[in-house]
């Protein structure tokens, strides 16, 4: 089926030229609210035989490698996310009574097509079930390009989306599930099979952990793979690095660099370290061949200067403690609230927070994505 669809839509794919990059680059043009339409019902779904697979059972079919779904497999769930704020982009989460899943619809302004609480019916035949650092995802075939290594890719073409995603009736927004630390620990221990991943949840009484995590790629021309330490700068294991905003837009990223609060950050990863970003250059790092050429004409500029030149919005993760368990709240640099400062009382530890969002897993750790502005998703106690 997939090969047939690709052949039919090859010309459309060339025209659309939509990127498969994992980094979020929202098109922040105004979009209309969901328009009136005639919703699908179970009786009107094309080819539906009357039986749904639960989201939990679908995810259980993943066995440590991408699986192209075959057969008349349908799931249904209610929409739990919106891309209005820019923090979730080119994907949508749906949830049934058994769990949630990340549906990789490669479009912007999805909130103009899919409303919170709306039921979506998903025909899974021909789609690919995979994981990104342990997080279940349902999308198109694996993206194994020179710069990316992902088990699924975005469903970019509307014609393909229309064959797989059917809009059902509107409904009330899903109420977040109030979870305990024990439930979160159990999901972490279960890895990919954790019951909380992809679900809309609330954790209560989270304390700020005074630590962040960020990973920057100074040269957009080089791969973003772990095997390219010359193109990696980590901010981790050293407090907050002067970051007091939820993330950083392009302007915020430049501002932090220019203030010098990241000067001691090193280029490299693991055991391979090239030196501080404010002193080392691609040439002095000993880079050679095409790798060095990719920095031309800035091979003798410091990495800090190169990072400012190639600046873009970037993710930041802030650590919180939920009991004794670490939870990262990860925010896109393209979110409308990227440069909003965390409340000083939260940072100081004077107050805790009840946080609502989509719970995910990343490399064995719990990670939160806010689905609304912090003023809505983060309530101080």
Residue ranges and their predicted role:
Residues 5-10:
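Sec-dependent signal peptide hydrophobic core
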Residues 1-4, 18:
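Positively charged n-region of N-terminal signal peptides that target proteins for export
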Residues 13-16:
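C-terminal motif of bacterial Sec signal peptides marking the signal peptidase cleavage site
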Residues 18-89, 93-119, 123-381:
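OB-fold nucleic-acid-binding modules
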